[in-house]
Design a protein with these regions (language model features):
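Conserved alpha/beta-hydrolase
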Residues: 50-69
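C-terminal catalytic histidine-bearing segment of alpha/beta-hydrolase fold enzymes
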Residues: 195-238
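The serine-hydrolase catalytic nucleophile loop
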Residues: 35-47, 182
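Hydrolase active-site cap/lid region
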Residues: 111-151
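Alpha/beta-hydrolase active-site loop
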Residues: 74-92
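N-terminal cap/lid segment of alpha/beta-hydrolase-fold proteins
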Residues: 1-23
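Conserved alpha/beta-hydrolase "acid-adjacent" motif
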Residues: 177-183
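Short beta-strand/loop motif that positions the catalytic acidic residue
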Residues: 164, 170-172, 176
Length: 238
């Protein structure tokens, strides 16, 4: 990525660290990373590929991750959604808004559709959660809830997707050992009002599909980037 601009956004007692990757086009893109050891660097290759196509993007490290730091127990699903909102406000993003979310970040992206207009959603190996877990701080209590058998079936994501009228791209991994394939299938099926939607399954890939997909500038990479751009442009009309 060229000409990265670092920024800090305030969220409660935390200083969220992020960066802006500029682009030629007016579309505004926010990337939300997943859980575990993930941080905004997971999006480096995807954001670079977007920049090559003229699209700028913003990403940040959630509380408990990367440069932002802090204890993961100081955050939660609702906290992560609030952190994304804080970044959107700080960067004044909002016109032709695209949100890209990976794994846990995909659920935060979905929840953002309840807070503001989002033109395009790109969900990569998306996780969804029961509402019972939404406000529970990360830690043993949160883990106990989400580890209940098929707890994700009770998610509110299906309803949210049913109300979504923008464009939707879901990228699933054929050999994902974390996210049941039913989840991306049902997200697409639930998006009955979407103006454009597509489910893309990456053959032979596991849950860590994001880095491997964009590190290798293969014909598959170019094909999937075509889908990403189509999703962004389907609603923006650019």
């Amino acid at each position: 990525m060229d000409n990265l601009h670092a920024f800090t956004a305030a969220y409660r007692d935390h200083a969220l660290k992020g960066d802006l990757c500029p682009g030629r086009r007016p579309n505004e893109i926010l990337c939300i990373h997943g859980a575990g050891k993930s941080d905004r660097t997971r999006y480096a290759e995807l954001r670079s590929a977007l920049q090559e196509r003229g699209f700028g993007s913003v990403s940040f490290d959630c509380v408990g991750h990367g440069e932002t730091g802090g204890l993961i127990e100081q955050s939660s699903l609702v906290g992560r959604t609030g952190q994304a909102e804080a970044v959107l406000r700080a960067r004044a993003l909002g016109n032709s808004l695209t949100v890209i979310g990976a794994s846990m970040g995909a659920y935060n992206a979905i929840k953002l559709t309840r807070e503001r207009r989002i033109d395009s959603l790109i969900l990569i190996v998306p996780a969804v959660y029961t509402p019972d877990a939404y406000q529970v701080p990360f830690g043993p209590g949160f883990s106990a809830i989400i580890r209940q058998n098929r707890s994700w079936e009770k998610t509110d994501a299906w309803e949210h997707m049913g109300d979504f009228t923008g464009s939707l791209l879901v990228i699933a991994a054929e050999n994902d050992d974390v996210i049941p394939f039913e989840i991306p299938q049902r997200l697409i099926a639930s998006a009955s009002s979407a103006c454009w939607k597509k489910l893309r399954v990456v053959k032979g890939a596991g849950h860590a599909v994001l880095p491997s997909l964009f590190w290798n500038r293969s014909p598959l990479h170019e094909d999937i980037m075509d889908d990403v751009v189509s999703c962004i442009e389907s609603r923006s009309g650019k």
